[in-house]
Amino acid sequence: MSDDVALPLEFTDAAANKVKSLIADEDNPNLKLRVYITGGGCSGFQYGFTFDDQVNEGDMTIEKQGVGLVVDPMSLQYLVGGSVDYTEGLEGSRFIVTNPNAKSTCGCGSSFSI
């Protein structure tokens, strides 16, 4: 998708830079970061991240800086208006989701409720 179109999910520069670095380490330019939601965690739903070289029918791909973020349609409905970012701090480094649809989140930020 083009940067000129309003996207339902933001893929930040920091996240795209980290994905680009990790893909270079794997030496597989076809890899994309997939964000998904599953049941579980202390708040009912949890975020997951994996690298995937497949884009399934119905998936949304957001391109930034030559790398892609892929989201399946079921997960996307819970992520609309949110962002995928990458942070480094005292707690370590990780991809994080900021989700305005979450009614509550757990302390670690990896699970949420709607």
Swiss-Prot record:
A GO BP entry is: protein maturation
Q: Which InterPro entries does this entry report, sorted A to Z?
A: FeS_biogenesis (IPR000361), FeS_cluster_insertion (IPR016092), FeS_cluster_insertion_CS (IPR017870), FeS_cluster_insertion_RrpA (IPR023063), HesB-like_dom_sf (IPR035903)
Tagged with keyword Iron-sulfur: yes
Q: Name one Pfam family in it.
A: Fe-S_biosyn
Q: In which residues is iron-sulfur cluster bound?
A: 42, 106, 108
Q: Which family does it belong to?
A: Belongs to the HesB/IscA family.
What HAMAP family has UniProt attached to this entry? Fe_S_insert_ErpA
This chain's protein is named: Iron-sulfur cluster insertion protein ErpA
